[in-house]
Amino acid sequence: MQDVKTKGHLHPISQAIFDIRSIFEELGFAIAVGPELETEWYNFDALNIPQDHPARDMQDTFWVKDPKNGSMKYEVGSMNGKRSERPVLRTHTSPVQVRYVENKMRQGIKPPYKIVVPGKVFRNEATDATHEAQFFQLEGLYIDKEVSLAHLKGTLEFFLKKFFGPEIEIRFRPSFFAFTEPSAEVDMKWKGKWLEVLGSGLMHPSVLSASGVDPKEYSGFAFGCGIDRLVMLKTGIPDIRMFYNGDLRLVNQF
């Protein structure tokens, strides 16, 4: 009798990233990646986050002691250029948007741009059932002429209904993010409760300018969410830390 070999399993986060990529590829989005070790410019300055914003505090961000400075070519307005060179573990995947657009503009390739960015991010915060020092985030970007909130709404509804099922309800609420204006939180009705699942909005003109795009000619939308949180909702996994403790009893269920 032949030995029956145990088959391997994809980690639920890896499976979710494959599914998310497939959904957005249906809409014509490309997949983009970028460095996890960033400069303060790309992680904060280029995204219109003030240099005195609390998100930059030591208790929220992992700063790198050595090297003390990274590579940064810009100094905009009242921003301190030396500060902008400081290296940091990226706190979100939004810096990839700036790098992607900047690179395309350098090559003379003008919009439209449609990308999604799944990747690992880092936050200097206490861990509990819903918070981890590292987790996976999804970022999305679409830049073209006359991009509107209607494009944003249609894209996110398509994504969430494909990922969770066509029966879900979705609503948009006004909110604030430094890099979008106007901004909206996206809630999903899941098992009878409204839950916040995404942040989104039309790209702030300052962010377009920082990437080399003329905000008078082009507009765009951006959105972001935690992939771990989406997987927790979809699978019923109650604790984000379970994704990272290496317990095969979790992975083997998928």
Task: Show the residue positions of the predicted features.
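TRNA-recognition modules of translation machinery and tRNA-sensing kinases, especially anticodon-binding
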Residues: Q2-F254
